[in-house]
Curated annotation (Swiss-Prot):
It comes from Prochlorococcus marinus (strain SARG / CCMP1375 / SS120). It holds the Pfam family Ribosomal_S14. The gene is rpsN. This is Small ribosomal subunit protein uS14. One of its GO terms (biological process) is translation. Binds 16S rRNA, required for the assembly of 30S particles and may also be responsible for determining the conformation of the 16S rRNA at the A site.
Amino acid sequence: MAKKSMIARDVKRKKLVERYASKRKKLLDQFHSAKDPMERLEIHRKIQALPRNSAPSRMRNRCWATGKPRGVYRDFGLCRNQLRERAHKGELPGVVKSS
């Protein structure tokens, strides 16, 4: 089980990403469409002024069962250990052993 503080930090980041997603997208669209270097610089400064944790790249995929940050399968949202356990128990529909 991951530390509760780390899980809470990721939840906080997820909320920030959702809150600033539209503003960040609008600024990035303006940045990519701008031709003037000074205008691009000004837009870049606005993007940098947004909270650091509002960037989607700062989010971490975590296992929803244990909160572990590593070895997480995107399709299931589970870490490798939980995926194996639940697959053996038959709790994951459509997942079968290969041999």
